[in-house]
């Protein structure tokens, strides 16, 4: 997936008025790989970045998060660039805002021949998202072919629709994604996206069942976020085990104090994948780790999560326990 440079005015300052920006790194697939690494699994990011000081900044952040940089390729061209986006926080009644500057980034010119065939070996799970497929024709071709090659070598395929209207239309997304769904094992799609992109009808459970009936997907996950204000959210999700034909749900995390919601969906995916891939994993575990990881990420500035497995398990314990909770970890 694409690695992005994020620039944000501090606190609640506005892009149109602020004079300084905080520099951070993110991107859907990197956010997920970072979350999985924090929870205890080995992860790496496949991407293309500029061979420059900005690219080195991104590489250093990747390493700091415990994510392998062995699968990066470097763009040495004069027009090499890292995609950029600007983000400002919201406060009721003003919504958060995003401005993208990612066209013609190094990632948009990715080519599958830049990667050695050894990357397809010994991988338990390959994850990508609709954002990556929407970036360019080169990204789409490379992403689809990698899905097929990883699947052929025995990896589970995880896919997050992550629909972005500013990147492609619902019809473009539907045509492309329906072509890869026969290869997908773990599918992340919100109820709203299922209706907008795939024309699905019915409630969320009926929508999930319809995907499982049409494609050989094993696990389908759908987040459910209630935005009370830019700073206060409720969050939970539904996971469907298509083989057992069983739904998994839990009570929502309520009144989450949102510091930064960017990346919370990716944190959810990382928790779900950890819950499925851990030694005693399954959908029940995926639900607990996914919901807790997403809820917790909302409280962390920047795109990437910053809580390890012990901290997430403490959050899960408090969420499931009635009665006294310590107000501080000490």
What are these regions (language model features)?
Residues 28-38, 142-149:
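Histidine-anchored nucleotide/phosphate-binding helix
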Residues 1-14:
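Positively charged, low-complexity intrinsically disordered leader regions
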Residues 31-43, 64, 275-279:
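Alpha-helix C-terminal capping segments
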Residues 252-319, 323-330:
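Conserved post-catalytic alpha-helical subdomain immediately downstream of the catalytic base
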Residues 150-156, 215-218:
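A short helix->loop->beta-strand "cap" motif at the edges of active sites that frequently abuts
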Residues 14-34:
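Short catalytic helix/loop segments, enriched in acidic residues and glycine
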Residues 167-244:
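Conserved phosphate/ATP/ADP-binding segment of small-molecule kinases
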Residues 42-130, 312-330:
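Conserved N-terminal subdomain of the carbohydrate kinase-like
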